[in-house]
């Protein structure tokens, strides 16, 4: 079977993205990784870190890189990069990495995209007059013409998808509607089947309120919104259980046999996942017409070029992309 080929965008050049991308040369992965970034920056960062990495120009027709080699699709930075120091001039470079990866998907060169972290603040500083940049997920959705995507994090056998994502806690209850729950659950169910190869995925659903509302005594979102949504989805053949109290749901005996958890909001599900995965978590965007995984951490500017950056999440993100490529065959 032909090895999948992934575009790995190296992210914010002043952060740890280039550092962790270099470690792919030693990861022995069952795929090809084309690192999109400035080849001179990668060479300089390798020298600063004392890493002996051979950088080779990416050629879709070649057989790939050997151990200790890294395939690079060279995209020059706009200005010189200093580790740990953001430069708004290079915001356009970061977006060009994504645009090049998307073009490679469209041309059939890449089987998916794996993203190292970018810095949303510096991108917004640079393009204040052209609209707000929300992040990788929204950018890739817009560029690919995808109406709705779902954020799911995975690590060490646990998958957690979110109904709502980056909202203030005071706005969460109003944002959780029956149509939203149903559409998120459908995307989650579809991609577990078609991108992970799970024939009949079992999804555990969290309630919103403590004790999942205690039958309406601690809030009505479960009885008025969540339960009716789950009943509709079950009639469609989707295998759902819940809603369960979140403090019960994440116990091992509950998770046994489950393929994913659907949490109602960001800090209901992700702290558990991140604690469970110990820095090996992966951010997965569901609903896109291609595979996209990412690290679950930020740019860590203070760690750039120090040798203290951990590439575990990036390597796991690539391994997850491979799993998805195999599941979608």
Curated annotation (Swiss-Prot):
GO CC annotations on file: cytoplasm
Localization per Swiss-Prot or TrEMBL: Cytoplasm
Sequence positions that bind substrate: 136-137, 274, 283, 292
GO aspect biological process, one term: pyridoxal phosphate biosynthetic process
Keyword Transmembrane helix listed: no
Keyword tags: Cobalt, Cytoplasm, Magnesium, Metal-binding, NAD, NADP, Oxidoreductase, Pyridoxine biosynthesis, Zinc
Cofactor binding: number and manner: Binds 1 divalent metal cation per subunit. Can use ions such as Zn(2+), Mg(2+) or Co(2+).
Catalyzed reaction equations: 4-(phosphooxy)-L-threonine + NAD(+) = 3-amino-2-oxopropyl phosphate + CO2 + NADH
Coiled coil: none
Pathway where it operates: Cofactor biosynthesis; pyridoxine 5'-phosphate biosynthesis; pyridoxine 5'-phosphate from D-erythrose 4-phosphate: step 4/5
UniProt-listed InterPro entries: PdxA (IPR037510), PdxA_fam (IPR005255)
EC number, as in UniProt: 1.1.1.262
Taxonomy, superkingdom: Bacteria
Regions that span the bilayer: none
Gene Ontology molecular functions: 4-hydroxythreonine-4-phosphate dehydrogenase activity; cobalt ion binding; magnesium ion binding; NAD binding; zinc ion binding
Residues annotated as binding a divalent metal cation: 166, 211, 266
Cofactor field: Zn(2+); Mg(2+); Co(2+)
Keyword Phosphoprotein appears in the UniProt entry: no
Subunit structure of this chain's protein: Homodimer.
Something else known: The active site is located at the dimer interface.
Function: Catalyzes the NAD(P)-dependent oxidation of 4-(phosphooxy)-L-threonine (HTP) into 2-amino-3-oxo-4-(phosphooxy)butyric acid which spontaneously decarboxylates to form 3-amino-2-oxopropyl phosphate (AHAP).
Family to which the UniProt record says this protein belongs: Belongs to the PdxA family.
The name this protein goes by in its record: 4-hydroxythreonine-4-phosphate dehydrogenase
Gene: pdxA
């Amino acid at each position: 079977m032909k090895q999948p080929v992934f575009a790995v965008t190296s992210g914010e050049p002043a952060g740890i993205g280039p550092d962790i991308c270099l470690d792919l040369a030693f990861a022995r992965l069952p795929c090809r990784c084309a690192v999109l970034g400035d080849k001179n920056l990668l060479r300089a960062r390798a020298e600063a870190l004392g890493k002996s990495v051979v950088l080779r120009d990416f050629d879709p027709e070649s057989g790939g890189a050997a151990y200790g080699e890294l395939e690079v699709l060279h995209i020059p930075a706009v200005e010189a990069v200093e580790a740990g120091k953001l430069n708004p001039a290079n915001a356009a470079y970061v977006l060009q990495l994504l645009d090049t990866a998307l073009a490679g998907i469209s041309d059939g060169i890449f089987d998916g995209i794996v993203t190292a972290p970018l810095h949303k603040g510096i991108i917004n500083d640079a393009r204040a007059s052209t609209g707000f940049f929300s992040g990788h997920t929204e950018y890739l959705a817009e560029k690919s013409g995808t109406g709705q995507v779902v954020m799911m994090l995975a690590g060490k056998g646990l998958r957690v998808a979110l109904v709502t994502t980056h909202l203030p806690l005071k706005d969460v209850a109003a944002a959780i509607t029956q149509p939203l729950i149903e559409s998120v659950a459908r995307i989650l169910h579809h991609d577990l089947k078609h991108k992970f190869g799970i024939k009949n995925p079992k999804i555990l659903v969290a309630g919103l309120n403590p004790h999942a509302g205690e039958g309406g005594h601690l809030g009505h979102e479960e009885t008025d919104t969540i339960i009716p949504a789950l009943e509709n989805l079950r009639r469609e053949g989707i295998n759902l259980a819940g809603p369960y109290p979140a403090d019960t749901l994440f116990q091992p005996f509950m998770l046994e046999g489950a393929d994913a958890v659907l949490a109602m909001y960001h800090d209901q599900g992700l702290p558990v996942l991140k604690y469970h995965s110990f820095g090996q978590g992966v951010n997965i965007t569901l609903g896109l017409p291609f595979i996209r995984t990412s690290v679950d951490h930020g740019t860590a500017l203070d760690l750039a070029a120090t040798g203290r950056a951990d590439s575990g999440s990036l390597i796991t993100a690539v391994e997850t992309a491979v799993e998805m490529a195999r599941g979608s065959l």
